[in-house]
């Protein structure tokens, strides 16, 4: 549990295991920060988790700025990283710099972008401009249309080789950490051993330098929990129970009771 503010320089190889979780608003970010996570990702997964979209492609930079502002206000200890959403960096370093700067001004202390060696030149420009970058290889949700769905990556020798090459390319241009998503555990282990920056797994086994999960999966608010996630609570049932009781008490006029209001 961090007892001081986490910085990107605190994330070093061999210093983990590092604990990351997503958060998208002030109250949940405040809770996970108090719980002692090392890092909070304001993920573009908010499109699916919070906004009800079928994937992350509809998330805008304005969405990310607003949610990053809320999370940053609530997290005095954890490192806050914001996702760069679809088509905010693919068009080149100039656009990436301008868009990343908006997220930094919103309170992010680093940005995360998906992709490997094909975006190394973009990452390099951001890092040289003083913007810390977290890489993201393996399953890239922003490529879901090209991939034909949310499918495991790294099952072939060619894919495995590409993942290792991508990790090294991102390491070479200065990322401080790399998310490795939904790849075989043995491949994640090889990727982790190939670079001297921390790897953070999601659905990629125990061999990375840390783990990250979507908060709603952790607390039981998701409609469906992925096979690689663990549900530690059932908050959805608690909310349902509480609101159903509220509905019943209002309709039977049991609420508000005398202690809930004042009279002159």
Swiss-Prot record:
Recorded superkingdom: Archaea
Pathway, per record: Cofactor biosynthesis; coenzyme A biosynthesis
Natural source organism: Pyrobaculum arsenaticum (strain DSM 13514 / JCM 11321 / PZ6)
Lineage, top ranks: Archaea, Thermoproteota, Thermoprotei, Thermoproteales, Thermoproteaceae
A GO term for molecular function: magnesium ion binding
Subunit structure of this chain's protein: Homodecamer; pentamer of dimers.
Name of the protein: 3-methyl-2-oxobutanoate hydroxymethyltransferase
Compartments, record wording: Cytoplasm
Keyword Iron included in the entry's annotation: no
UniProt catalytic activity: 3-methyl-2-oxobutanoate + (6R)-5,10-methylene-5,6,7,8-tetrahydrofolate + H2O = 2-dehydropantoate + (6S)-5,6,7,8-tetrahydrofolate
Principal location listed in the UniProt entry: cytoplasm
Keywords, in A-Z order: Coenzyme A biosynthesis, Cytoplasm, Magnesium, Metal-binding, Transferase
Binding site for Mg(2+): 44, 83, 114
UniProt family annotation: Belongs to the PanB family.
GO BP, one annotated term: coenzyme A biosynthetic process
EC class of the enzyme, as a word: transferase
Gene: panB
SUPFAM superfamilies: Phosphoenolpyruvate/pyruvate domain
Cofactor requirement: Mg(2+)
